[in-house]
Amino acid sequence: MTSKESICWYLANILLVTCIGYYSYKTPFTKVEESFAMQAIHDIQTYRWDLSKYDHLEFPGAVKRSFIPSLFIAVLSYIPSWFVNPLLAARWTIGYLSWESMNSVSCSISKRFGTLSGALFILFSCAQFHLVYYMSRPLSNIFGLIATNHSLSLLLKNNYYGSISILVFAAAIVRSEIALLLMCLILPLLLQRRITLSKLLLVGISSSLAAVGASFLIDSYFWGAWCWPELEAFLFNVVEGKSSDWGTSPFYYYFVRLPWLFLNPTTLLFLLISFVYIKPARLLIYVPLFFIFVYSFLGHKEWRFIIYSIPWFNAASAIGASLCFNASKFGKKIFEILRLMFFSGIIFGFIGSSFLLYVFQYAYPGGLALTRLYEIENHPQVSVHMDVYPCMTGITRFSQLPSWYYDKTEDPKMLSNSLFISQFDYLITEDPESYNDTFDVIESVNSNTKIPILPKWLSNHIPREISIRNPAQPVYILANKKARATKPAAVDDYSSFIGHKVDEIKLWPPIYRVVSPDTLLTRDYREDRLNFFIDKDRILTHITQG
């Protein structure tokens, strides 16, 4: 290890952890596929043993997921959450664990193929937006990525059984498709006689029993019933084929998608160089390729399902790229061209990443709308109903204030009941026209269907607008039309209206709701709220507080 290579390695790692932290800071909100883990982390930190208040009991999702990764993150991020935003604390904790796993791979590459190869592995990864962007996100695939990275690190150290054991744990607890990656690794190791079948069975069975036992005990406690979540998810998505309900893609989808995920046009070139000139690196190429090939037979495809393969390819590319810094391996002219191509590819990747980060900030209108509502309304006790789409695009329990009441009712019949919906002070919805009778639009997020590419100071000097389509729907903040008093009210202030139609009330208390015989009430108790009970003719019968 030369001093220059060592400095390069340290700087590359600092750059990677900085990118992960900055990306999560610029886009702190999460989407629906991340909601289970995010809500679980919040509930474990907030409610601890009081499972009755956990979000998954009301919104369990299509399939069960393991609580083990969320429990781990909740414990690690608990103390940091005292000093920074709890949402960011959780995101940064996941990001740190992801970086540490990448650093582990880099160290193993450095010991086997040279420090420069380890540094180039990190550089390749830094310039790949999708990999870095998702490394701090509470996705089960990212928890799986952390595990598969550590497995890859042990593989590079020739610790084959340790590598296999980690993959078994990850497949049993986090993501079942990792079992396919495990099979794709075991086959060449057996054929090359790097492992024996007897010891493989011993390690595999013991690891499986430990992993399944841990998941069965811990997850059964949180779910309130005996279960092995990842087995249920596998049966639901693969055996029953229910994953296709979320859409299907052609067989070649992943292979077309890979160059876009690399974001660096030279990655494939250095993969080829590595395959041709460095025999030990070939395992890093055909194992993930075979994994992607077999996985492509499943109709429902999302790029995050194959994210585990990206570090394998990056490792092989980095080993191949390190040859371009070795003048004795190639002619001088070829050496200069390859080195120029390497740096050009890295620069291109960073430019593309900067652009994509800017665009992705528009992908969370729900979270942005709730943040904007906090800027508009500073009353300590407010009730908000949030429709499905805003909750899918950034709203989590981490975003909620303890003194506010939040409702996520999805039943169309209840939402169409004017008395039910009128009990809320504000609505956050993508469909404001459904509530025109009782609410006014006061703010919108993502109302512009286009995302401007150029900054304002530059676009003012260009006659033609340069923009791209905004894929996210607009979200609106609606305020209740009824006028309200600014000070808390008591029952006696409105007792004179008893026996009269409730519509005669012109100035309503700050916190209230109207209750008809068929009204389904929210279950919260609020000390300052007045409840106006009416009969079928809208005559006020009595008033209560709370």
UniProtKB/Swiss-Prot annotation:
Location relative to the cell: Endoplasmic reticulum membrane
UniProt entry tagged with the keyword Transferase: yes
Superkingdom of this protein's organism: Eukaryota
Main localization (coarse): endoplasmic reticulum
Keyword terms of this UniProt record: Endoplasmic reticulum, Glycosyltransferase, Membrane, Transferase, Transmembrane, Transmembrane helix
Transmembrane segments: 5-25, 67-87, 113-133, 166-186, 200-220, 258-278, 283-303, 305-325, 340-360
An individual GO BP term: protein glycosylation
EC number: 2.4.1.260
A matching Pfam family: Glyco_transf_22
GO molecular function, one term: alpha-1,6-mannosyltransferase activity
Metabolic or biological pathway: Protein modification; protein glycosylation
Catalytic activity: an alpha-D-Man-(1->2)-alpha-D-Man-(1->2)-alpha-D-Man-(1->3)-[alpha-D-Man-(1->2)-alpha-D-Man-(1->3)-alpha-D-Man-(1->6)]-beta-D-Man-(1->4)-beta-D-GlcNAc-(1->4)-alpha-D-GlcNAc-diphospho-di-trans,poly-cis-dolichol + a di-trans,poly-cis-dolichyl beta-D-mannosyl phosphate = an alpha-D-Man-(1->2)-alpha-D-Man-(1->2)-alpha-D-Man-(1->3)-[alpha-D-Man-(1->2)-alpha-D-Man-(1->3)-[alpha-D-Man-(1->6)]-alpha-D-Man-(1->6)]-beta-D-Man-(1->4)-beta-D-GlcNAc-(1->4)-alpha-D-GlcNAc-diphospho-di-trans,poly-cis-dolichol + a di-trans,poly-cis-dolichyl phosphate + H(+)
Entry GO CC: endoplasmic reticulum; endoplasmic reticulum membrane; lumenal side of endoplasmic reticulum membrane
Membrane topology: Multi-pass membrane protein
Family under the similarity heading: Belongs to the glycosyltransferase 22 family.
Chain's role: Mannosyltransferase that operates in the biosynthetic pathway of dolichol-linked oligosaccharides, the glycan precursors employed in protein asparagine (N)-glycosylation. The assembly of dolichol-linked oligosaccharides begins on the cytosolic side of the endoplasmic reticulum membrane and finishes in its lumen. The sequential addition of sugars to dolichol pyrophosphate produces dolichol-linked oligosaccharides containing fourteen sugars, including two GlcNAcs, nine mannoses and three glucoses.
Record protein name field: Probable Dol-P-Man:Man(7)GlcNAc(2)-PP-Dol alpha-1,6-mannosyltransferase
Species for this entry: Schizosaccharomyces pombe (strain 972 / ATCC 24843) (Fission yeast)
